[in-house]
Regions:
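Beta-strand/loop-dominated core regions that host nucleotide or nucleotide-derived cofactor-binding catalytic loops
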Residues: 167-171, 186, 190, 198-203, ...
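N-terminal segment of the mature soluble domain
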Residues: 33, 40-121, 159, 234
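Gram-negative (and chloroplast) outer-membrane scaffold detector with strong preference
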Residues: 302-388, 393-397, 429-431
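Outer-membrane beta-barrel "beta-signal"
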Residues: 419-432
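Short secondary-structure boundary motifs at beta->alpha junctions and helix caps
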Residues: 150-184, 238-257, 375-378, 404, ...
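Short glycine/proline- and aromatic-enriched beta-strand/turn motifs that initiate or cap beta-hairpins
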Residues: 281-310, 431
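Amphipathic beta-strand/beta-sheet edge segments enriched in Tyr/Trp
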Residues: 116-169, 258
Length: 432
């Protein structure tokens, strides 16, 4: 009896331990149809480019084993395909030698190959327009692409339907306008994929030493510097298991199978096997701020690249020197400073310090409504440097103060004056 009791204890301990093990994502099999476009005229070269870029996104994102098909489904054919998948999953269906889904045909072998994937993705164009804007003397192109994600492994359930709107314009070439619209698809598609819960990376801490942690998975699953992972805490209430976010980690370095992270905050101590969950972001911090420099008021915004960059992060910014702006019924003078630079991010828990520097140009639009006169010109060259101290008030928002210096040199000293000096300011940052 003692031996049986000890054995039962070990079995129960084993089962409980197995239930507490963290989840670690592995690559999923995914099949991607070619782009369906029935009802829309799309240049053949553009069609091939869209197909290639869509395939590249699913391949480069790192978390899938991808195989594609040359077949294209229309919106009507998509529903027929889903219905056929469901009938096949339910069994007792005579499998034909050839399927027809709208305008597309699949052989029995092609259909079975697709149903062998865990997920099937069907992209379909729902809008494609190219037109010449005579007033602006510009070609414009707009594309709306729908993506339907079908979980073939579980009764052909549609797990997500995403729509991506892109546009492009060019003054000299229609083809260039189309390509600009096409090139805008991949970054939006990647973000959409990473936002779908079934595709988000789950992983665990391998080792914790103070604020530095080693994390299972790396470039082999598409992790990048600047990615953020939530620390997940599991609680059990009776027979209900609940989870909540209990902290935040930013990825600071990535190797092939292991990544290094920095703990920004955590509500409890961390150890090996702590569960982590990917937070999908577009990879940009959007800052709104108000600066004062040498008596000049400078409201503005800044966009800093966060995904793929750490600790050096490039940024672009726009600010308006209010002291040089004139808006009346007679004349409008609107100056805008465009700034390009980089910051060096140093996190210290919820706080961070970020020295930064940048250079810029001032663009001025002058309009005289009574006589219909308008002109645009570059008026200043500028530079700025300083430091930022920020505090992470929540997972997605920072508050910060800036101290530094600005200097703006006029290109035309007859009509414009230099300005700048000690800069102080404050703002709010949204992690998008």
């Amino acid at each position: 009896r003692l031996a049986v009791g000890v054995a039962l204890v070990f079995v129960l301990a084993s089962l409980l331990g197995a239930g507490a093990q963290p989840v670690v994502s592995t690559k999923q099999d995914i099949a991607v149809f070619s782009l369906g476009y029935y009802g829309w005229f799309i240049p053949f070269q553009a069609l091939g480019t869209i197909d290639l870029k869509i395939q590249e996104v699913f391949s480069d994102i790192g978390r899938f084993r991808v195989f594609g098909t040359a077949q294209r489904l229309s919106s009507h054919g998509l529903q027929q395909f889903i219905d056929a998948l469901r009938r096949t999953k339910q069994g007792n269906v005579v499998v034909p030698e050839q399927y027809q889904f709208g305008e597309a045909f699949l052989t029995k072998a092609e259909f079975e190959r697709l149903t062998g994937a865990f997920i099937v993705v069907v992209p379909v164009v729902t809008n494609f327009a190219v037109y010449w804007d005579a007033k602006a003397a510009t070609w414009h192109c707009s594309i709306t692409t729908g993506f339907t994600f079908i979980d073939v492994a579980h009764d052909a359930t549609v797990i997500a339907v995403e729509s991506i709107d892109t546009s492009g314009s060019d003054k000299t070439s229609m083809n260039s306008a189309v390509m600009y619209a096409i090139n805008a698809i991949p970054p939006q598609l990647e973000y959409k994929i990473r936002s779908i819960p079934q595709f988000q990376i789950s992983t665990r801490i391998l080792e914790a030493q103070g604020p530095t942690v080693k994390i299972q998975l790396g470039a082999n699953m598409g992790l990048k510097k600047g990615d953020e992972y939530a620390i997940v805490e599991k609680r059990t209430f009776g027979i209900i298991e609940d989870t909540r976010e209990a902290g935040l980690i930013v990825i600071t370095d990535v190797s092939q199978q292991v990544s290094t992270g920095r703990v920004l905050y955590a509500s409890a101590g961390l150890n090996a096997d702590t569960q982590l969950k990917e937070i999908a972001r577009q990879g940009v911090d959007f800052d709104l701020y108000f600066h004062s420099s040498g008596g000049q008021m400078l409201p503005g915004f800044r966009m800093t690249a966060s995904r793929g960059f750490y600790p050096l992060r490039p940024f672009v910014g726009i600010q308006i020197p209010l002291g040089n702006a004139i808006v009346t019924t007679v004349v409008d003078i609107v100056p805008v400073n465009a700034i390009f630079g980089a910051e060096y991010m140093i996190p210290i828990g919820r706080f961070h310090i970020a020295p930064y520097a940048g250079v810029g140009l001032t663009y001025v639009h002058i309009a005289v409504p009574p006589i219909g006169y308008e002109s645009d010109s570059l008026t200043h060259l500028g530079a700025q440097a300083g430091g930022r101290i920020g505090y992470l008030v929540s997972r997605d928002i920072r508050l910060y103060v800036d101290v530094g210096a600005d200097y703006w040199l006029p290109l035309d000293r007859i009509h414009f004056r230099e300005y700048g000096g000690l800069t102080i300011g404050a703002g709010i940052s949204f992690k998008l």
